[in-house]
Amino acid sequence: KMGITAKGAWESVKRHFREMGINTQTTDFTVVGIGDMSGDVFGNGMLLSQHIRLVAAFDHRHIFLDPNPDPAVSFAERKRIFELPRSSWEDYNAKLISAGGGVFPRGAKSIPLTAEVKAALGIDPAIEALTPIELMRAIIKAPVDLFYNGGIGTYVKASYQSHAEVGDRATDALRVNGSELRCKVVAEGGNLGCTQLGRVEYALHGG
């Protein structure tokens, strides 16, 4: 069943893209996100357009990488997982993930990076592997059309704010600055995904 929070967040996504001349219901666009398909906000949100190209996502358990997804194939697989009880990214059919992608546990020591993942996330080609924390930060900072946050925690602050000011110690290691975001649009489906000053800094840098 469709959650109202996701629907509201998606209406704002459509409006922001419309202002840039992009119709998210008819044009393919790239997305990174926080959440998984069992979550209300993320799961519902990632089914609100059949043109989503979800290149990377993470939740508290896994990191999902699909650097060159087929919109129709990935939409159908996300829908299948959404309808499974208590699903996780591990339920995603590995055969449907594009070359260079995969699903990795957040507890891994390090995650090897393929050329495809580095290109999709805008990571220096010389880097061969990242820790899960480093990779999740790279996902948040990826040069995509949309960063869709359906997670719990504050992931974006202003560069002149300290982590202590944010008051969310659990997310300190993942948090980035508004000036570091390279996405065109941020959708805050989660609660307090960015500090207000982080939003302002992102907007001042063209977001």
Q: What name fits each language-model region?
A:
Residues 1-207:
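Non-transmembrane, aqueous-exposed alpha-helical and coiled segments at domain scale
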